[in-house]
Amino acid sequence: MAKGKDVRVTIILECTSCVRNDIKKESAGISRYITQKNRHNTPSRLELRKFCPYCYKHTIHGEIKK
């Protein structure tokens, strides 16, 4: 039987440098990845280095609210 909330949750990772550069309108968009995390192992916000196709480099992608 399920107890409480699900352990695995779906999260969205967003490029932090695209968000900062959005004011200058240098990038064509904002890179986002959809993945899952285990709430018991990682209770805090997740940050991963992923490739951003708009910045053309590996940047830090942080977890955002839905």
From Swiss-Prot:
Question: In Gene Ontology terms, what is a biological process of this protein?
Answer: translation
Q: Kindly list the GO CC terms recorded for this protein.
A: chloroplast; ribonucleoprotein complex; ribosome
Which SUPFAM superfamilies does the UniProt record give? Zn-binding ribosomal proteins (SSF57829)
- Give TM regions: none
UniProt xrefs under Pfam families? Ribosomal_L33
What keywords were assigned to this record?
A: Chloroplast, Plastid, Ribonucleoprotein, Ribosomal protein
Molecular function terms, GO-annotated: structural constituent of ribosome
What subcellular compartments does it reside in? Plastid, Chloroplast
Does the record's keyword annotation contain Plastid? yes
Q: Which Gene3D superfamilies match?
A: Ribosomal protein L33 (2.20.28.120)
Q: Which NCBIfam families match?
A: PRK00504.1, PRK00595.1, rpmG_bact
Q: Which family does it belong to?
A: Belongs to the bacterial ribosomal protein bL33 family.
Q: What HAMAP family does its record include?
A: Ribosomal_bL33 (MF_00294)
Q: What is this protein called?
A: Large ribosomal subunit protein bL33c
Q: What is the lineage of its organism?
A: Eukaryota, Viridiplantae, Streptophyta, Embryophyta, Tracheophyta
Report which gene this protein is encoded by: rpl33
